[in-house]
Regions:
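Interfacial aromatic-anchored transmembrane helix boundaries in multi-pass membrane proteins
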Residues: 1-13, 41-75
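Hydrophobic transmembrane alpha-helices
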Residues: 1-34
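Helix-loop junctions at the membrane-solvent interface of multi-pass transporters
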Residues: 2, 53-54, 82-86, 114-115
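Hydrophobic alpha-helical transmembrane segments
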Residues: 19-23, 34-39, 65-70, 91-99, ...
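Structural signal for the C-terminal ends of transmembrane alpha-helices
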Residues: 27-31, 78-86, 149-153
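Alpha-helical transmembrane segments and their lipid-water interface positions
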Residues: 33-40, 48-51, 75, 79, ...
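Short helix-perturbing small/polar motifs within transmembrane alpha-helices
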Residues: 58-106
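Membrane-embedded alpha-helical hairpins and interfacial helices in multi-pass inner-membrane proteins
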Residues: 87-161
C-alpha cells in the first residue's frame, strides 16, 4: 500500500492513492477493484495507518480530505466499468477516467469546503489546481501499466471469478 507515502504540500497531501485506485480497478475490474479500495478504506477507518502520512482512523476519513477518499469509490467503479465494457477503446477509457477524476475533485472539494468553511476559490487553489497535472500523469500511467498487467493476469482473474461464482 503506497497511500501512507505522501508529500504534505498543504491541506491536501500529494499521494499515489489515485494511481492505485485506477490500477486496482483497471486490473481487477469494476467489482473487485472497488472492493479492494473499500477494504483499504475500512482498514484505514479502524485505525490502521494506511492513509497519507501514515495515519488512519475515523477522523482521517471523516475529516477535511475525507470527501476525496470517499469519492475514490466512484472513481474505481467508473474505471472498472469502462475497462470491462470498452477494453479496446483506450481514448474512451482515458476520458471516463478523467471524468471520474473531475467528479472526485468536485465531491472532495465540496466536502473540504463544508469541513473547513474555506472559500471555494481558495479551496480549488489548494485542493485541485496543484494536483491536476500529476493526477493526469497518474491516469496515463494506470493505462500504460494496467493494460499489460491485466492481460497477463486475464486467465488467472477469470478462473478466480468463475470459482467465486460457483
Amino acid at each position: 500500500i503506497f497511500g501512507p507515502m505522501s508529500i504534505p504540500i498543504g491541506a491536501v497531501p500529494f499521494s499515489l492513492t489515485p494511481l492505485l485506485v485506477y490500477l486496482a480497478a483497471y486490473i481487477l475490474g469494476m467489482r473487485n477493484g472497488t472492493v479492494a479500495y473499500l477494504v483499504y478504506l475500512l482498514i484505514g477507518f479502524v485505525g490502521v495507518p494506511v492513509m497519507s502520512g501514515y495515519s488512519g482512523g475515523p477522523a482521517k476519513i471523516l475529516g477535511p480530505t475525507g470527501g476525496y477518499l470517499m469519492a475514490f469509490i466512484l472513481m474505481a467503479l467508473m474505471t472498472g466499468f469502462v475497462v470491462e465494457r470498452f477494453y479496446r477503446n483506450i481514448p474512451l477509457q482515458a476520458v471516463v477516467m478523467f471524468v471520474a477524476l473531475i467528479i472526485c475533485y468536485a465531491a472532495g472539494t465540496a466536502w473540504f469546503v463544508g469541513q473547513t468553511k474555506m472559500a471555494l476559490s481558495k479551496a480549488l487553489a489548494v485542493c485541485v489546481y496543484p494536483f491536476v497535472p500529476l493526477d493526469c500523469i497518474k491516469l496515463g500511467l494506470a493505462i500504460i501499466i494496467g493494460r499489460p498487467v491485466r492481460e497477463r493476469l486475464r486467465g488467472f482473474l477469470q478462473a478466480r471469478s468463475a470459482a467465486s461464482l460457483a
